């Protein structure tokens, strides 16, 4: 269904929604706070918020502020057996991990509304054998545009993104700078995302956009480079180096090293010498 929340007649000020549907809303005003999972949802006027089945959203409306937003809600059953049903998992803005809203330009808002209008037009027609497919395709068109806007958001925030990448590099250096204090575990994408105040999903998309590598691949590459330095610059055993880097089991370190470098750490030491 296509909805216009400005036409609502009842405005509870504090409630929790357990979504059994997919939902996208273009917010025309910030009417209060949204808690999405365990985090606050970053949204302002002119942004798109998105939710998926099974997700829980806590809403606190500001007194005297009417919700002003247009959007669409659709049940998973609507897209089963369609191309959208197969692709829905690739729209990363539906993830719980993505708590950053999509910020739209004026032209993008018009495109968003046009897609809603197309869905509404189809919903207003008598149902026939083409209805489900056409509705699903128009929803898919809307989601594809949102993915384009989402990627555009990375481009227009390029300077900010590069600052995040530099901060990521610094954090990696700090994490591994001390050989005297072995790390208790390998660093995770979430660890670094939290450090730069981004969700893991958004941080991962940003790093992928800037480097061509996933955040996990980038971390792994850093670990391998540091491992190479320590293998050649010291007489420490492979096990000692593995523990310093945060590997619980040396054989895990050896397996990853060989996969990336093409030889074991011991073989690498012999070859380089």
Give residue ranges: language-model regions:
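Short acidic-glycine-tyrosine-enriched beta hairpin
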Residues: 38-50
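Append "Primarily bacterial transcriptional regulators
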Residues: 46, 191-198, 203, 207, ...
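Terminal helix-turn-helix DNA-binding modules in bacterial transcription factors
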Residues: 209-248, 270-273
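Generic protein-terminus/edge-of-domain signal
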Residues: 1-41
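…primarily DNA-binding HTH/wHTH and HhH modules…
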Residues: 254-273
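An amphipathic alpha-helical interaction segment
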Residues: 110-170
């Amino acid at each position: 269904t296509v909805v216009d929340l400005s036409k609502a007649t009842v405005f509870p000020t504090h409630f929790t929604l357990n979504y059994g549907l997919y939902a996208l809303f273009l917010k025309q005003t910030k009417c209060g706070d949204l808690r999405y999972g365990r985090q606050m949802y970053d949204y302002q006027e002119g942004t798109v918020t998105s939710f998926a089945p099974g997700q829980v959203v806590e809403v606190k409306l500001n007194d005297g502020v009417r919700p002003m937003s247009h959007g669409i809600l659709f049940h998973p059953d609507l897209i089963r057996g369609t191309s959208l049903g197969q692709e829905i998992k690739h729209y990363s803005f539906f993830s719980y991990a993505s708590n950053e809203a999509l910020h739209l330009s004026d032209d993008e808002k018009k495109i968003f509304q046009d897609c809603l209008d197309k869905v509404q037009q189809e919903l207003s027609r008598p149902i026939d054998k083409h209805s489900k497919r056409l509705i699903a395709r128009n929803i898919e068109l809307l989601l594809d545009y949102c993915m384009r806007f989402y990627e555009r958001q990375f481009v227009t925030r390029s300077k900010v993104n590069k600052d995040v990448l530099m901060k990521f590099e610094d954090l990696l250096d700090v994490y591994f700078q001390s050989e005297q204090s072995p790390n208790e575990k390998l660093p995770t994408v979430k660890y670094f995302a939290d450090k730069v105040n981004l969700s893991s999903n958004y941080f991962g998309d940003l790093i992928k956009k800037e480097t061509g590598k996933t955040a996990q691949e980038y971390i792994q590459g850093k670990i391998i480079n540091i491992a190479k330095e320590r293998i050649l610059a010291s007489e420490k055993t492979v096990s000692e180096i593995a523990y310093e880097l945060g590997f619980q089991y040396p054989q895990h370190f050896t397996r990853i090293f060989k996969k990336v470098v093409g030889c074991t750490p011991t073989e690498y030491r012999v070859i380089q010498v």
